[in-house]
């Protein structure tokens, strides 16, 4: 009976690929309607003006314009403003 028993398998030997989360459009960048602004799990950043939220909490632009990340009371928001609106504010 001089033989080795079968070795057990390891349970933790695999690693999943990264999910490519994070900022996809930076502050001040022009985006087209439907463009993804931020990929996230949960609402780390909330949708602001002209920004929608997908079922996986992805933020996307509802109109074409300039992205602005804003801090409001204890929350961060991503908004998209039309170029004409930004010119009118100046």
From Swiss-Prot:
Do the record's keywords include Hydrolase? no
Which GO molecular function, any one, fits this protein according to its record? structural constituent of ribosome
Top-level taxon in the UniProt lineage: Bacteria
Region annotated Disordered sits at 1-21
Which keywords label this protein? Ribonucleoprotein, Ribosomal protein
Write out the similarity annotation: Belongs to the bacterial ribosomal protein bL27 family.
Q: What is this protein called?
A: Large ribosomal subunit protein bL27
